[in-house]
Amino acid sequence: ESAVNYRLSFKANSPLVSQDGYIVYNLPETEQGIKSWEMSRLNTDRKSTLEIPYLITETYDYLLSIEPGIEFKSNPVEIKKQNKIGSVNIRIRQINNTIQVHKEIQLSKNTITPAEYGDFRALLTEWQNPLGQKLIFKKNDINK
């Protein structure tokens, strides 16, 4: 087997959704990664072996600059989980006017037994946690 590496770079001016005075930014992710496996809903237990398509390390690093008048409203996130199936690391923090986001999941087994399924599910549940997928901002009224 050979590894495939993708490097994605983009610049976006306004992929934002405004809701009730708040701005929601959905962090982009590749359609070729775990998202392509369509495993957004996982049962709590499993009676048969699960085969995932391939071993994967999926990593995203984002740096977002905030303009004056925009306030970052999301809480900082620090998620670290490791088990015999792999690991998940998600960190979101603000440093001055920059938001730093790091997301990484690594799966080291592609055949998951029913006994291991709970560990697999725990990793995917953290990876799909909405806290690590959306950033919330509020535009301040500077005319007050």
Predicted regions mapped to residue ranges:
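A sensor for short, sequence-defined functional sites
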Residues: E1-K144
